[in-house]
Regions:
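Amphipathic, small/basic residue-rich leader segments at the start of a protein or domain
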Residues: 1-96, 113-117, 121-124
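Short, solvent-exposed loop/turn elements at beta->coil junctions and helix N-caps
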Residues: 65, 134-139, 165-166, 203-208
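Short glycine/proline-enriched turns and hinge-like loops at secondary-structure junctions
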Residues: 71-72, 141-145, 169-174, 211-212
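N-terminal glycine-rich flavin-associated loop
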Residues: 93-113, 143
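A short, Trp-centered hydrophobic/proline-enriched beta-strand micro-motif
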Residues: 125-135
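Flexible, small-/acidic-enriched active-site or ligand-binding loops
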Residues: 146, 196-215
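A structural signal for short hydrophobic beta-strand segments in well-ordered beta-sheet cores
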Residues: 149-152
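A short core secondary-structure module
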Residues: 157, 161-201
């Protein structure tokens, strides 16, 4: 068994490590780098993301045909390990949850039309996204089969009724993937933050920092 990384991946790994050391880790000791929820502040994030793009390290998990690096699991693991040496790392490379998982889902199953409208803006860093799945008890948490939110088709449109919580990034997201029950089972719906009929009731505090995580 060969435990060595291919040369092209190892070069990207080293490049990622050097970028994190030079541009990201030093920010952790600067109080103004943080927002009120202990994430990297949005202005600084935008600046670092521009540098990542210039270095050719943006969205390594996305196919080259959609402006990513097109890495497979081994390459992604190598680069993600380096990014996660900083709590700010994953989000700077567009590799933080929930965007990371949402991009993967959309790239796998969305139609081309849906990809252009919903996926590409996330890939480009123009918008952020969230996954609305978890519900208060007795609704679905880690078990989606328990989801209580219902969607019914009425007069040519879908009407969704339910309550979700612990929706990571909902406050800054523009694109949402929402899971609801239909007569055929669970269905994932795409919606934009500006669509009417929904609202955020409150931000739920948690124990510890809310820093962006990576997969």
């Amino acid at each position: 068994m060969d435990f060595y990384l291919p040369d092209n991946i190892d070069k990207l790994r080293i490049k990622t490590r050097n970028f994190v050391d030079k541009h990201i880790i030093p920010l952790e000791s600067v109080p103004s780098s943080y927002d009120n929820h202990e994430n990297i502040n949005e202005t600084l994030l935008s600046e670092i993301r521009d540098k990542v793009k210039l270095e050719g390290l943006w969205s390594p998990q996305i196919p080259k045909s959609r402006s990513g690096l097109g890495l497979g699991p081994i390459g992604m693991a190598a680069l993600y390990e380096e990014m996660n040496r900083s709590i700010f790392g994953p989000v700077c490379f567009n590799c933080a949850a929930p965007d990371d998982g949402n991009m993967y889902i959309l790239n796998k199953i969305a139609t081309e039309e849906q990809k252009v409208e919903w996926l590409d803006p996330i890939i480009n860093g123009d918008v952020r996204s969230s996954l609305a799945m978890t519900e208060p008890a007795p609704g679905g948490g880690s078990d989606p089969s328990m989801i209580k939110t219902e969607a019914t088709y009425q007069n040519g449109k879908w009407r969704i009724n339910g309550l979700k919580w612990y929706i990571t990034g909902a406050g800054v997201a523009s694109h949402f993937i929402l899971l609801a029950k239909t007569k055929d089972g669970l269905t994932a719906f795409l919606y934009h933050k500006d669509q009417p009929g929904w609202n955020i009731k409150r931000r739920i505090p948690i124990m510890g920092p809310e820093e962006h995580g990576g997969h």
